[in-house]
């Protein structure tokens, strides 16, 4: 050490000596490349640092600051491109087409009249897509039963309809949902608003299709808007981080007064991607929040979203295997199915425990249970149009739902949920805007519109690629002839295109006015 200290070497001299050798140059280059590579990815691991990983604190600006500039620049560019596309002139819908879409919707939403509503030729494009247009206005009739003090929408990850069908019952995947629906109400001719969690939640909460995920608003058709006006404390409770699809920002823009994500529920989460298990989520909602005032609670689960990290053995939710008679051609890997179905069983059990606990504490509560979209883990890779699209609508609340039921021949989707809940909770004379139906009101020729699918009381139509129409599974003796299929496909296309076109233009005009 004394010899080394007696002959000090400057840093430039050391670097010069080191770089005289090819091995040193190579080593330095590799180290520098690794540092740059890891820096750009943001972490050491199989997956680069993503926006979902940044929701680790309760402060959004601090969260975004954890991401590297390259990633933030790319994210900003993607959002800019999305907004540019949303407001592109090429997406504008011609006046005549818009008027025809409006005529289809007005006619569909007012079937009790014997005359088809006429859209005046002089009507401007702007009036049809204004939230204040008379055809979109509703006046609540007053709740037919006891008004709920607390409303809970359990927006369950991939909680679809097919496990409720009798032929799959022995799998035992949704026994809690089945029991609650047997004691309450269940609608199986029902569709999600979209085929992804984010966009489906936007339809459910905003009561309209095609809203802009990058710029949300508290619009007149929305659930948050209505329940704020009705005096409820509006809560948005999520089993994932605040930056997952910007869920915290979106909820606040929609008008929710309270927003809870992983950072508030359990900092760090339960999984590798900062999700919290459904047990943690529902325990937070039941034990950490107060209910001394009327509340509207939108709860989004995440356990049935990969990666599946629930300890199924500890939760006693393991699936032994797929019964022989349910095995079919094109069946997926059984080990993967068992893992997925065990997680679904766990998620279903957690929602059941939560509902039972809360209804005991707050008997004047209403619970709405539905899936965000159809699942991704069918037994076969080619499910039919019903099993590959539908989610159930379950409503539970003995004191609130006493004496009411879904009329025979009812079909619906997430876009109808706002209207249905407002009519259950609002006093007579309450005014609101809506493009949906009240599912408790008899409705001739009922229907439900989603993304690429339209459901009717006895059939479902898939509009992807070559359109297809099949009878619903419980319509055992019903067979559709070619003419009936053609008529339903044509009707489905009209309704689907009208809902999405009107929704897009209403949202676009509203945002354009807000940004001026």
Model-derived segments and spans:
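N-terminal secretory/membrane-targeting segments
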Residues: 1-149, 166, 170, 174, ...
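Solvent-exposed soluble domains appended to multi-pass membrane proteins
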Residues: 114-516
